[in-house]
Amino acid sequence: MSGLIGKTGIVVRNIPRVEPHMIDALGRLGVATVHEAQGRKGLLNTAVRPIQQGVAVAGSAVTVLVAPGDNWMFHVAVEQCRPGDVLVVAPSSPCSDGYFGDLLATSLQARGVLGLVIDAGVRDSQTLRDMGFAVWSRAINAQGTVKEVLGSVNLPLLCAGQLVNAGDIVVADDDGVVVVRHGEAQAVLEAATQRADLEERKRLRLAAGELGLDIYEMRPRLAAKGLRYVDHLTDLEG
């Protein structure tokens, strides 16, 4: 499949999608927990950031490869979207132009798309926030685009340092964006749920006043590293 990265002039109509209840569960667990649970992989570069706060989405990836400064394939991709999808877009070479604005967002909302992840720029940012259309982007840029060059829809692509396949699960919130492979969804969900349960137990202990030093049994390791305590600064004199 890696040989398909960068191919243009192709639209794949049918993609695998994970069961919605699994996607929703991963979304509730959040980016940080999912990222840790799957071995700290799948996290997009921190340059791709939310343009809003307090919003979390999780959905199936519809992937879009676009040419620099050209948003033609967005319009092609809209037709392939289903409710619960997340559009994942990357340019074939670096570009920060404003590929996406409120008109395309309106079209995607009408299809039930939850949000956009783009390794490039968007514009109409305040309107997008007012609409409640969630966006994670590399840039906010009023510079517009043209419609001349073919890209692809639903082929594998590299987005902000991560390989994304159509149908992979995209989890996005204030902490960033993480991708879960379609075939690993069940295992990652189980691991993330276990992690969340463990963290809740630790949270209760911390709230009761117990120290992380003791919960995580850090003292022996700190001592082995040479950490020492003194009662007063004057104890270090001489």
From Swiss-Prot:
Mg(2+) binds at residue 124. This is 4-carboxy-4-hydroxy-2-oxoadipic acid aldolase. Pfam families: RraA-like. The lineage of its organism: Bacteria, Pseudomonadati, Pseudomonadota, Gammaproteobacteria, Pseudomonadales. It comes from Pseudomonas putida (strain ATCC 47054 / DSM 6125 / CFBP 8728 / NCIMB 11950 / KT2440). It catalyses: 4-hydroxy-4-methyl-2-oxoglutarate = 2 pyruvate; 2-hydroxy-4-oxobutane-1,2,4-tricarboxylate = oxaloacetate + pyruvate. Gene3D superfamilies: Ribonuclease E inhibitor RraA/RraA-like (3.50.30.40). Transmembrane segments: none annotated. Catalyzes the conversion of 4-carboxy-4-hydroxy-2-oxoadipic acid (CHA) to pyruvate and oxaloacetate, the last step of gallate degradation pathway.
